[in-house]
Amino acid sequence: MNKPLPVTMGHSACPHDCPSTCALDVELLDGRTIGRVRGAAANDYTAGVICAKVARYAERIHHKDRLLKPLQRVGAKGEGGWREIGWDDALDLVAEEFLKAEARHGSEAVWPYQYAGTMGLVQRDGIHRLRHAKRYSGQFDTICTNMAWTGWFVGAGAMRGADPREMAKSDCVIIWGTNAVATQVNVMTHAAKARKERGAKIVVIDIYDNATMKQADLALKLRPGTDGALACALMHIAFRDGTADRGYLARYTDDPAGLEAHLATRTPQWAAAITGLDVEAIEAFAALIGRTQRSYFRLGYGFTRQRNGAVAMHAVMSVPAVYGHWQHEGGGAFHSNSDIFGLDKSEIMGTAYRDPSIRTLDQSRIGAVLTGDAEALCDGPPVAAMLIQNTNPANVCPEQRPVRRGLARDDLFTCVHEQFMTDTAGLADLVLPATMFLEHDDIYRGGGQNHIVLGPKLVEPPETVRTNHFVFEELARRLGVADRPGFGLTERDLIDNMVKKAGHTEGYEGLKRDRWIDCQPPFEEAHFLNGFAWPDGKFRFKPDWTGGYAPNRPPDSLGPQGPVAGLPVFPDHAELIEAADASHPYRLATSPARQFLNSTFAETTGSRSREGAPELMIHPEDAAREGLVAGDIVTIGNERGEVRLSLTVTETVKPGVLVHEGIWANTDFLDGEGINTLTGADPVAPFGGAAFHDNCVWLRGGA
């Protein structure tokens, strides 16, 4: 009879692309095997709660289809022919191909391409050290945060806000533009605590009746891309009804009189016509926050993934400034704490030898880059070699057809370092197997909360699997730059140096003992009661959209992006979205699925079985007009391509709006083309970004 394995408990942090960065307790069954993963109860933001997909992480780390050996392509790209190759030979091949590309076209012909498949600062960002040391093309990270961060920053002047734990002390929690039940479960933990202990109301604003909307006391379902109009109506009502805090406005904001005059025509009736909301619902929401000083606005990314997304974020975060909610514990607003952590990544990233004259390529425009668009290439050489880590561009990037066409080029060498045979890995010349987060050392910071969290190595990886850090280091040695600063150090060395530089004198060992560091600023700083982070200390209702610093401003060589002339002077609804027309009558949003995180977890049985299959939600009125019923196979399309999938008829969505949840593998769709076939890569004003939820399509029935 087999004895059960002894269980010990290890401590880590969730590495995935989620603002929560949950602190974790992990069952360790032996040196290579894990059991259940739980949220750390001792961490007062995680509060013992994590999402179901991470709780089932044993299913992923021990998956039968996990990549375990380096593979070299045999036959044509994408045909699926592979042969095993040793690690030394594989890395020799990468170095050889990089040097060939450099000899033919110069160093900029090599493009290391990465993103947030891990949020660990060492394993994610160390690729830049190799990039800068070798003068390879830079990457402008536009795919996720640009619209949201730009919109917040132009108002507040810093990326911080009210302590996210204060949601539990609020009397009204407004969850705007994020399906927190699916994507940020800890938001619901603290909002539910406020409801239980204080009788707080939960307001949810989104474009369809998702799981978070179903938990709301007041649910406002508006048309995609119209959040700014709702925000303006709320502020109009505040000035109209005397619930605007004029004393706060005079002390803390730049031009309240100009804003009030601007909003005179932004009535609830005006907003109702734009948003599709009832005037009564807008008035009720305004009355609630007008009488509730402790109103906490938790602002997500989803509503900013429109072509007017930066404008929408600025308009929405202006609301608590007009009402004066910032003055009260449990009030104000929060989007990201990315400014508070004080971690200097320069050694990890090798920024000391970054050359600003080297071109920077827009990651969201990878399709245009790889298919030779001169503007996307900054009028420079073609990209001839790539190392891709922590992302799956053939699946997650906009304008999927040119992305895949570019990756399939015979004259492009692509090495993909991955955990599974993703859509991108399937188009590579060389695939290297990567460790998972419990198999290496790293450090994390939670933009959606307030902690630096250590993720130490807890189990041994399979013998033939290697870390990102190993790949950077080995390529640096083969490419002749291993003597540069930052190379030759272990992950723990880099963590120790960075933590000590931030003032935590015990470094790695101290963090390992304590598990996390709480970096939340004092109340007055978090609530901007000492002034907003501009020289005059004023919140800016009149932002400088293009003239100042931004958290992710494009390099000067790229300049402002998108139709900047359409950006408004004051908070407003900007008509910059992809508007429906007679040829494309439906607005399509590609919303997150509960069981997936971008394209991660789409390979695990538990997540796949709970999600079912790719489906398209349509309102019954639209289905009846099109002569369609549930289960029909439909095609949706625009000038970027077409996608076939099954139909779900539901009042969850508004008439004229289609919703597809989750980034399924391309191969899960009937024609092998994923939902981002339909997503545009045109840059969003003012500093770029991908408008994933801002697409117009036609719809046709018939298989």
Where on the chain are the PLM-derived regions?
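N-terminal export/assembly segments and adjacent metallocofactor-ligating motifs
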Residues: M1-D241, D255, D278, Q389, ...
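Phosphate/diphosphate-binding loops
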Residues: A13, V403-R404, R409-F413, H417-F420, ...
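N-terminal leader/propeptide and maturation segments of large enzyme subunits in energy/redox metabolism
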Residues: R73-E84, D241-V279, L458-R540, L588, ...
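Glycine-rich phosphate/diphosphate-binding loops that line cofactor/substrate pockets in enzymes
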Residues: L91-V110, D163-C172, H262, E283-Y296, ...
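Extended redox/cofactor-interaction regions of prokaryotic respiratory oxidoreductases
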Residues: D125-A194, R198-I205, T212, G228-C232, ...
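Short beta-alpha connecting loops at secondary-structure transitions
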Residues: K214-L222, T435, N450-P462, S607
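Active-site phosphate/pyrophosphate-binding segments
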Residues: L234, T253-L370
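Long, contiguous, secondary-structure-rich segments that constitute the structural scaffold
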Residues: N468-D514, S599, T604-M617, E621-A703
